[in-house]
């Protein structure tokens, strides 16, 4: 999946450019995984846009897994010694010259293997089957009919049943490899599911990892638990203990600086590091004046007074707003904010002095996306707008305690660490903050209006018990004014747009279908309680074609 350039809070204030340097890659490779003592599954990535969903499904079942590009899979297999392997889908055709293959070492090892889409095709071709390309393509929903019993289907699908799945393939198998049999068919795929239960090989032409295959997560669970025999010992409690030991070993008696954004990633990283090394950690919170109502005060109170973590609070709001005056282009806003953040953060770090390490809230998707499945820098990467090359500029080593976690796992870890739910469960917030929720030029007055309108909107959502049902909700102050009537007088005030979406990963999203009574009540409250607003509209655009944020 791609990475939005507005993801500072989601990735941690000091997340670096995703295209990591060779030196950083060398450092990562030499650092033992905290999962070294756990059962592991290796996921070989052939370039599917949903490979990360496979990993999330496996992790949800309590089993640690890692994603590696196909051309690094042999090395990873030898190092990890996984108990099972999953071959992902991908955009290539098995018939194309130079198309990727799984290492033969995997098939010679005796571990269970599940091939998904392209993974099924290359498994069949490599094990002696035949595959043809370009005919009878299937994309979208399809029904698979179960033709034989399988451990993969236990307590999920019964023989003869038809079940909805999500197809996305061009190639198809025409002759099975020796030892395989048909377990399921679809109208355009007579070998939709194949298996060799003796060797524990399973091939699926559909994608079990996506929500459009309703029983897909159960099929993956059966592969993980019943076929591979893994028990699920990957927990946030275990991760917490192991990562604390790892941080202590890495840092020793050194000093660490961590940037706080108010987002969950940087908050969890800071609390975990502080638990490991205490006051060797100093946090720097740069308030750019673009945060939500009372958010800066909440961050300072939590870390300085609740956790007693050394915190430098820098109110740079005048500097940021001064530089943003008259700026209307969204990308220029981002770059301006990013440049200023680097300048302010670097200046404060120099004042602290003597720091050996820079802590970052890098997540596992950042690590995955730093390299494409072909092994080079991913062409889909967009630069984070915040710190760029801070680690290199400041000659500091990196501490990245969350680099093996997905976002939902970070939230679980936050709860394990005892962070308040208002921090752990809050909706994603863009790094440029309200700057990209205020299209057009930015002023202090506009930001005050937007903060208050957003606070009323979120308060309404919480009061109606809807907050946890929504992926992200926020208000936007539109750069237009409209005529209204309040009392006996004419008004000419701003329009507020309301946005709320449901999503599983932020890559696609549907607008949340509020009850009209709720929208009416919310609009009335905003107009009555927020001076400068006389009209409220609701955004019913899905993603795609729109994006979640307006800028």
Swiss-Prot record:
Catalysed reactions, semicolon-separated: XMP + L-glutamine + ATP + H2O = GMP + L-glutamate + AMP + diphosphate + 2 H(+)
Active site: 117, 207, 209
Example of a GO biological process term: GMP biosynthetic process
This protein's pathway: Purine metabolism; GMP biosynthesis; GMP from XMP (L-Gln route): step 1/1
SUPFAM superfamilies on file: Adenine nucleotide alpha hydrolases-like (SSF52402), Class I glutamine amidotransferase-like (SSF52317), GMP synthetase C-terminal dimerisation domain (SSF54810)
GO cellular component, one term: cytosol
EC number: 6.3.5.2
Domain GMPS ATP-PPase: 234-426
GO molecular function, one term: ATP binding
Domain of life: Bacteria
Alphabetically ordered keywords of this record: ATP-binding, Glutamine amidotransferase, GMP biosynthesis, Ligase, Nucleotide-binding, Purine biosynthesis
CDD domains for this protein: GATase1_GMP_Synthase, GMP_synthase_C
One matching Pfam family: GATase
Boundaries of every Glutamine amidotransferase type-1 domain copy: 40-233
Assembly and interaction partners: Homodimer.
Purpose: Catalyzes the synthesis of GMP from XMP.
Protein name: GMP synthase [glutamine-hydrolyzing]
Protein's organism: Bradyrhizobium diazoefficiens (strain JCM 10833 / BCRC 13528 / IAM 13628 / NBRC 14792 / USDA 110)
